[in-house]
């Protein structure tokens, strides 16, 4: 074998040995893969805003009637208004 081929194979094998073995997609998945867009504000008991570097804005709501958790579409008008008020309240001087 050529020395260059052996060197390249050694580098590839070293890189494979140093990796964790799991692809990024399997090691971390976004909690909200699907969004509910028909959730009324009156049915929400609690909102949780998830801030993760690999995922878009994710909002999880606990519903009043059945205590179920659902992911809410962040594009809903009442969610946008809620976020705007929360940010204004937090950063108000």
Swiss-Prot record:
Keywords: Chemotaxis, Cytokine, Disulfide bond, Growth factor, Secreted, Signal
Position of the signal peptide: 1-21
Region named Receptor binding: 39-41, 48-50, 60-70
MF terms (GO), sorted A to Z: chemokine activity; chemokine receptor binding; CXCR chemokine receptor binding; growth factor activity; integrin binding
Presence of keyword Secreted: yes
TM ranges: none
GO CC field: external side of plasma membrane; extracellular space
Binding, heparin: 41-51, 62, 69, 85
Region (Receptor and heparin binding): 29-33
UniProt xrefs under SUPFAM superfamilies: Interleukin 8-like chemokines
Short sequence motif Receptor activation motif: positions: 22-23
Presence of the UniProt keyword Ribosomal protein in the record: no
InterPro entries: Chemokine_b/g/d, Chemokine_IL8-like_dom, CXC_Chemokine_domain, Interleukin_8-like_sf
Source species, domain of life: Eukaryota
Gene3D superfamilies per the UniProt record, alphabetical: 2.40.50.40
Subcellular location: Secreted
Pfam families: IL8 (PF00048)
Disulphides: 30-55, 32-71
Annotated site, Important for dimer formation, chain positions: 46
Cited function: Chemoattractant active on T-lymphocytes and monocytes but not neutrophils. Activates the C-X-C chemokine receptor CXCR4 to induce a rapid and transient rise in the level of intracellular calcium ions and chemotaxis. Also binds to atypical chemokine receptor ACKR3, which activates the beta-arrestin pathway and acts as a scavenger receptor for SDF-1. Acts as a positive regulator of monocyte migration and a negative regulator of monocyte adhesion via the LYN kinase.
Quaternary state and interactors: Monomer or homodimer; in equilibrium. Dimer formation is induced by non acidic pH and the presence of multivalent anions, and by binding to CXCR4 or heparin. Monomeric form is required for full chemotactic activity and resistance to ischemia/reperfusion injury, whereas the dimeric form acts as a partial agonist of CXCR4, stimulating Ca2+ mobilization but with no chemotactic activity and instead acts as a selective antagonist that blocks chemotaxis induced by the monomeric form. Interacts with the N-terminus of ACKR3. Interacts with integrin subunit ITGB3 (via the allosteric site (site 2)).
Protein name per the record: Stromal cell-derived factor 1
Organism the protein comes from: Felis catus (Cat)
Biological classification of the source: Eukaryota, Metazoa, Chordata, Craniata, Vertebrata
Gene: CXCL12
